[in-house]
Amino acid sequence: MQKKRNRAGPPQQEAASDDGEMSDSSDKMEVAQGKGKSAVKRAPDADEVLRPVKLSKSDLYKPPTNDELNRLKETEHLFHTNLLRMQIEELLQEVKLKEKRRKTIDGFLREINTLLGTIPETPQTDLTDQTWLPDSIKVPILQVPYQVKGKFCFLPPSSIKVVGSYLLGTCIKPEINVDLAVTMPQEILQAKDNLNQRYSRKRALYLAHIASHLANNELFSSVKFTYMNSNHLKPVLLLRPYGKDEKLVTVRIHVCPPPGFFKISRLYPNKNNVRTAWYTEQETEGVNEPPTPHYNNTILSDLTLEHHLHHLSNCASDFPGMKDAVALLKVWLHQRQLDKGYGCFNGFLAAMLISYLLSKNKINKVMSGYQVLRNTLQFLATTDLTVNGITMATSTDSSLPSLHDFHEAFQVVFVDPLGVVNLCADMTTNKYHQIQFEARESLKVLDDTSADGFHLLLMVPKPFVRTFDHVFHLTNVSKLQGTCKKMKLLNQLIDQGGDYLATSLPYVLSILSKGLGPRVALLSHTLPHRPEWDIGEEPAKHRDSSLLSVGLLLEAELHTSVLEKGPAADSSQALDFRAFWGEKSELRRFQDGSICEAVVWPGSSLCEKRKVPELIVKYLLELHADIPESCISYTGNVLDCVLTRGKEAGTEEEKMVGIIQSYDDLSRKLWNLTDLPLTVTSVQGTHPCLRYSDVFPPLPVKPDWSSYQLLREKKCLVPNPEKPCPAYVAPVKVICHMEGSGKWPQDKDAIKRVKAAFQIRLAELLRAQHQLLCNPSATHTDVYKDGYVFRVQVAYHREPQYMKEIVTPEGMLKYQDTEESLQLELETLHLPSLTSTLHGLHQQHPAFGGTSRMAKRWIHSQLLGDSFSEECVDLLVAHLFLHPAPYSPPSSPQVGFLRFLHLLATFDWKNSPLIVNLNGELKGPDYTEIQNDFISARAQLPVMFIATPKDKKDSLWTKTQPTAQILQRLIVLCLESLRALEQQLMDPSGSQDYKMTFRPPLDLYDILIRLNPKQIPRHREAVDQPAKSFFRGLLKEGAQVKDLMFPVVGYDPVQCYLQELREAYGEFALFFHDKHGGDVIGVLWKPSGFEPQPFKTTNMTGRVMDGKSAKPLLVPNVEAIVEDFEILGEGLVASVEARTERWSI
């Protein structure tokens, strides 16, 4: 048989980008003479071949030098292992710019320098007369209002200087940005150009004229505009080289005023430089002009470019550790999406912070890059710049603005060495708190000797949607204009030059922080990012900002609270509480007798309670910010829909609580049984619902007799073939350990018979003493209680030992693991212990159960559920909660599921064991032992190896499944599902069909067996709810029943059919199915099953003689096999679809 397959590998990961920062200052651009030639490779001469050096005995045992000793000590004290040091050094080598590339960039800069000097002058015109510009060029600034005083003419630059990270040697790959500061001649500017955006307009016109003369030059592949850090008052010109170096570098041209041109005291944060009458175009006599700190700061940052670069150059001289630390911090920031956009923490800010720590002796010039990184993270983690700002200024000039002045004007304060520029002017309180939070979490990772700190900190990306538990998007940013009006933010809007997003964002976040209160540990937002645009297009408007998304990191215990208790009715704060919460606030009497203001949110189920943060966000934004609910896309709980069944709303956590309560009651009854020959020593449940991780927990059932056939002698019901298959009743397994005693026999077969007697006796006593309906068998007793069926299995702790006994021909007694003994140990020892531990984990992390259920639902929906045990998935999910770095533990099932997909897709299953430290029992030496044992025995171990404190060497839950091929298939599905789902969650304008990733791709399969929904008992559990449902023989919960009959337990015709298929044809094919309501079975032929076999009676099943072969060989009888699929499933199989375009015989 030949297969016709399209091989599709996993999608290529896009290279991460790193935004070079604008480091301020300038040295004249040095023009090196000559061009570098590429080295020609040649074969080395025989004499040049490297050979091992033979050391003399004295050299071999020579004591280490001081440098070597220092390096060894540093490695011992600072790095957990020498590996971490090598990893960091390797990363720095990878991201730093190579000398060859630097020479290419230098050549490109020299040519730009020459071109800029040849741009012609223009005659002087009014600022508003822009007819001299070609029609193909648009001014890269929003000119609102358009009328402004002033004259403009273009004159060649008075200087062109390289500034920023390129000159400092701190720019990193893959996105190399080189900043060119082009200084406007003094003749272009007038004394009052600091007023009313005159300087900003002239700066933009200067850039536009440069762009018009570079646009058609063959040197450039593209000439575009963008805003520097998305600040619309600071457009820059982007130049990229033509040819193979197009992606090597982007040169950013900044226009700045001559040093010292503007009087700095006029630009202090408490000064006004934008007149209200000019901005509103209305007369406003007698109005106090508000300060314009952000506008002033924008001009000052241009003025101080050169000073900042000199400052950083002085700090970086003789300090290689600073350059390394800046590079590492840039990678760290980039992985957390903190380095781009309006109010970002970019590389320039990182370099300035390091220079501040150097000036305060928090670090010194002999420190390595790693030491500096740690100290910087420590400073960020412990210093709140929103409360206690810092300044680098050493001047004692009392006329300079104080830190208090800066705090009055800005949310985050970090003042430059001149004492006039706030380097964090555009940053919000919430964004800085996120940076603090990330720094704290990173230090924990670095201090954890069991974690791979380097990988978690610098190699794992933290996309916004995977970092926060809940995310919502503002789909129509222009609605924030109404927010500014509602909140009366005209003064702030003037300061921000009409940027209503930057104006309103801090106030909106403040309202949300107050409303959500203790429900959130962190509230942050994406950084508004305006796109680059063509020089012939109108400049990017405020509404063109990238989607504004807000993330909530929830407090696990508090975010589902439905009560917001306010102050006492007669207190002074009651009025403020009522004003804040509006009509939602009401007076309530509490159990302690107090009468207080309160807000109560709906929440009858956990599914509904998870939506409380969403209700708060939508209500407060409409009440205080005039943002209607229709403009908010809240994606925090959208995947809950895959955990609902039928018409019932909710994700059924309450059902599991009901089962656990019934189980606890049964446990007490078993403990207290009298007249048992031996006492019960423990009762332990093993069903997934007892650890809150069953995808669809058992429902309480009351069978309707009319839908069944009655076996009166057994007083139980059986399915009626004339009617739809009865509802699936899952037995909840319970292990009942009996005490050890000399009465137990010492033979495994005799023990089984004694256990069978115990099962019968248990049923009799439960019937007699507690009036419970019981159905005993040789291996278990089914107990019908509260509508649930509990399967009680008696266990004796020494039974596995007797099963291992083997008597040799010599009469020696040996102990050897057998399949039967291992299975019994798994069921009666390991599984109860694991269930108990995971039950405790759910109590600690309430999102564990929901995450595990979602993960299992997805695996089953991909038709791979039979290859992964419930316990395997539970342990994978437990790893996300016990080892969450670089994240915090998930507090919502949805974000837990995203991280589950990422873990499966990116973990190195081939070379690493996944260690799940349940109850924190594993210590440092245990990790080393597991790693070493794994490496030494890798070939004999399962492809997916999961180690726990009680299972360090065997990986019990993945011993037989999955196979390497199934795991590889799952990894590909994880990558694609994660990409598609995260794209959906971050793009509210796209498809809102979130079930898309839960629908399996069927094009892979050779045969599809379509099933009759009438005979699928779990049809209501399907991802896509069936339009038509069938009566499954169950009465409603409140229905009265005269005489209870034992329901049909564990009957699923589809599973019976699958078992028959695998037993009969497992040699030829693999069978895939979703047990949760799936109506299709995917069949994949095994290539090995189609190899001709010798003519023997053992090979006859499913085969015929090969007529084409001279020898008597057997080949599969495909037509008969496909026909058998239908015959075996008569009544259950609707059709068999042989997709012969995929295979041929």
Curated annotation (Swiss-Prot):
The keyword Transmembrane helix does not apply. It holds the Pfam family Nrap_D2. The keyword RNA-binding applies. One of its GO terms (cellular component) is small-subunit processome. Keywords: Chromosome, Nucleus, RNA-binding. GO terms for molecular function: RNA binding. Gene3D superfamilies: 1.10.1410.10, 3.30.70.3030. It comes from the Eukaryota. One of its GO terms (biological process) is ribosomal small subunit biogenesis. It is found in: Nucleus, Nucleolus; Chromosome. Residues 1-46 are annotated as: Disordered. Part of the small subunit (SSU) processome, composed of more than 70 proteins and the RNA chaperone small nucleolar RNA (snoRNA) U3. Part of the small subunit (SSU) processome, first precursor of the small eukaryotic ribosomal subunit. During the assembly of the SSU processome in the nucleolus, many ribosome biogenesis factors, an RNA chaperone and ribosomal proteins associate with the nascent pre-rRNA and work in concert to generate RNA folding, modifications, rearrangements and cleavage as well as targeted degradation of pre-ribosomal RNA by the RNA exosome. PANTHER family: NUCLEOLAR PROTEIN 6, NUCLEOLAR RNA-ASSOCIATED PROTEIN. Belongs to the NRAP family. This is Nucleolar protein 6. The lineage of its organism: Eukaryota, Metazoa, Chordata, Craniata, Vertebrata.
